[in-house]
From Swiss-Prot:
The keyword Mitochondrion does not apply. It comes from Caenorhabditis elegans. The chain crosses the membrane at residues 48-68, 102-122, 139-159, 162-182, 201-221, 223-243, 307-327, 345-365, 377-397, 410-430, 445-465, 472-492. This is Facilitated glucose transporter homolog. Expressed in seam cells from the early embryonic stage through the L2 stage (at protein level). It holds the Pfam family Sugar_tr. Residues 1-37 are annotated as: Disordered. Residues 69-101, 160-161, 222, 328-344, 398-409, 466-471 are extracellular. The lineage of its organism: Eukaryota, Metazoa, Ecdysozoa, Nematoda, Chromadorea. One of its GO terms (cellular component) is membrane.
Amino acid sequence: MNAVVASQNKNDRSFSNMESESSSNVEKSEKENHHQSLPDENWTPFLFFCISSIALASFQDGFQIGCINAPGPLIIDWIKKCHFELFGEVLSQYQADFIWSVAVSMFSVGGMFGSFCSGFLADKFGRKSTLLYNNILALLAAVCLSTSKLFNFYPMIVFGRFLVGLNCGITSGLVPMFLTELAPANLRGKCGSFHQLNISVAIVLSQALGLPQIFGTQVGWPYIFACVAIPTFLQLATIPFCVESPKYLISKLNDREEARRILEKLRGHTKVDEELEHMVQETMVTVEPLHQPGYVSLFKGDNQWPMIVSILMMFSQQFSGISAVTFYSTLIFKRNGLSGNEPMYATVGFGCIKLIATFGCLFLIDHPKFGRKRLHIAGLSGMCISSILIVITLTLSNAGYHWASYMNVLFILSFVVTFAFGPGPIPWFFTSELFDSATRGRAAAVSATSNWVANWMVGLTFLPINNIIHQYAFLMFTFFTFTFAIFTWKFVPETKGKSPSAIRKELAFMRKRICS
């Protein structure tokens, strides 16, 4: 890595010149291969129906992230009572906190396993079938979590969190890929962002349900976990009417006629020959003997650098610190002087603002003047500046300057909003734009697994580090967001509206120019 940085410092050409040179190189190569850009398509009612139905699976992910915040203390008290009734032992507060921490972390453990398996399942059984049967895990988890108090058996919560982690892990690898494979090239960003949009909606709803006025009581908290069955049943009712990915049908089943029929239905017209030919050409270029079996081939040859970039894009999302703010937002607000139910209200309010910002990203991500790269760099840069200001205002607040507490809340808001405009939605579907049909499933699985690993690491380490160095813990995120912003600027091409082959050529050219 040091060698790469050193070579970057020696590079005397400006990035803009390099980028234009790269684009010219790619365009020339595309013309030589007789590739033409696909015509822009519009939203159709059926495309919107399919995208909305598929993205319902993402609701589970966001709900499980947000639902544990408010009722956590209530569940810990119940665990202590339940343990005494089961085993006749009195748990200390530390022991009860540890059991609850294990239950919370099992979500990430399940997510790692589920995301790693998602590529195999998607390629073996198809995108649609995998998504359909994945709902079984969600329903089993909902039963375990919501009836744990009824049966007075807290290990059901631990097991339920693992099951729902498996479900969400499969979802995180499958849904962004499925969405972008159904979308036309000019709408890939909008369609891919539905994954993060549903996560944001679910986080807000779960936090609202956890308020004391609704289900945030000793009697009501099991109903929070039962609510996740609603979108699960809704998807079970709608997904059978959706279509399979045409790219999957061509690359895995060689069923061009069915792929054509699906494209005509999605696009709302019969002029799909050009798009179908692009899919066939993509398959012909990429379906070649792989010398390394399974996932190993992703880290060999032409796949190696795109896979590394995909993983680092996922790291840029999680190491930005958004998980720390999401998991511990109530605690952060309490330390800022908010009391009573005010921290919970503030957390719900922030979730609503983040949701609005995610909606804003939908309109910018495919805009000619923005695209993925600029939004991602802008988001990381905004988070970098916000994290510095959070540290400054927390320091002033601790020194007795009460006005700084209000400024701190403002900068946390800035931190969350800038995340929603780039690092939130973009990494999820970025991998699907880099890889072709033959390797997309496995690549999406590996990148999603890296996201879960990073999420687990941040959730596990932030609170202990924060207890030691206090507000200066946010300087970690300053370093990471700055580093990943530079990385995106130097090594990540714009993917908006481009084919995987064109993107990979530009990616290879950028790497060669910078590292030479």
